[in-house]
Design a protein with these regions (language model features):
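Alpha-helical membrane insertion/targeting regions
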Residues: 1-205
């Protein structure tokens, strides 16, 4: 029962936050994270391309990535698994590169920037490794790297959980954002490590 509830919560959060970028097209640009950006940055064509590429394709990756972990879906339709995988890979590669670029302009300065840039690099590299493993038919290694990849992707969810909590604790958005730049993904990777270790012990991967 606990496992089922955890899975439902996991999928629900992935879907909700995966659809979240659509809000940026429905409300004024002063909303949310954009309210902390300087006008000259918001008027930059290159930055806007990077920002919207990152949030749209990152949202897509989050929205469809969980499907790959469903053994039932994979068993029933391996073709769907492969097609979703290709779409996920494409979305991640473009979103992570865009994320690395906009990371240089992150609110909170160099510490915040390094956090998000590191996340972008790790997301790109783990996904690339997952792709190379499956190309070489190394299924277990592929599965492990995909867990790490989606753990990095899930940072979009954990960021939105931690940020309001940190703002309430510190009473300052900038301070909270510097912390969340690391807190949104480092614990995720630690959890991914525990999951892959446990699955390896059970012989699943």
């Amino acid at each position: 029962m606990i496992k089922k509830i955890s899975w439902i919560l996991f999928v629900t959060l992935a879907i909700i936050i995966g659809l979240y970028p659509g809000i940026y097209f429905l409300i004024p640009r002063e909303f949310g994270l954009l309210s902390s950006k300087k006008p000259e940055l918001l008027n930059s064509i290159l930055w806007n391309i990077g920002f919207y590429t990152h949030i749209i394709l990152g949202g897509l990756a989050l929205l469809i990535g969980w499907i790959q972990f469903s053994s039932k879906i994979r068993a029933r339709n391996i073709r769907l698994h492969k097609q979703v995988g290709k779409l996920y890979l494409t979305a991640v590669f473009l979103s992570s590169i865009a994320g690395i670029y906009i990371g240089f302009y992150a609110t909170g300065g160099i510490v915040s920037s390094m956090g998000f840039i590191s996340l972008g690099i790790i997301w790109f590299c783990t996904t690339l490794m997952a792709y190379l493993h499956i190309r070489n038919k190394q299924i277990k290694q592929h599965q492990k790297m995909m867990i790490y990849s989606y753990a990095a992707c899930f940072a979009a969810v954990t960021l939105r959980i931690w940020l309001p909590i940190l703002i309430m604790i510190f009473g300052d958005f900038n301070k909270a954002y510097v912390i969340v730049a690391w807190l949104c993904w480092v614990p995720n990777l630690l959890v991914a490590k525990l999951i892959t270790r446990r699955l390896s012990e059970l012989g699943f991967i």
